[in-house]
Amino acid sequence: MNVEKILRTVPREKAFYFFTSIGNYTGISASSIGEFMEKINEVNIKSLEFHFHRGDFEKWMAEVLEDKELAEEVRKLQKFNLSGDALRNRLHEIVSKRVRHLTSQPSSTEPKFSVF
């Protein structure tokens, strides 16, 4: 695990763009895990539900941020079939715990992360 790589700001073309449905961009994007954490509380709940049920969050986390552990924790939420504020709150909790965990670790270590 490369902490600096996970916490970095990615180029604009690799940012996460929030949509409420295909073709309906919200005007909100996130270029880092920290920015993504902030946007969870700002974006329309319909956007969170849209991306969550498609698996878009974990795909971006695994492929762009290269944080497979966080992607797996978000994927585990699928079994709870969350929506509305319950989804927003749980997603924010998982991402914020991950950010705190990453920012408190020396970059040379590879501690295990799990919220379950």
How does the language model describe each region?
Residues 1-116:
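Terminal, compositionally biased segments used for targeting/anchoring and flexible tails
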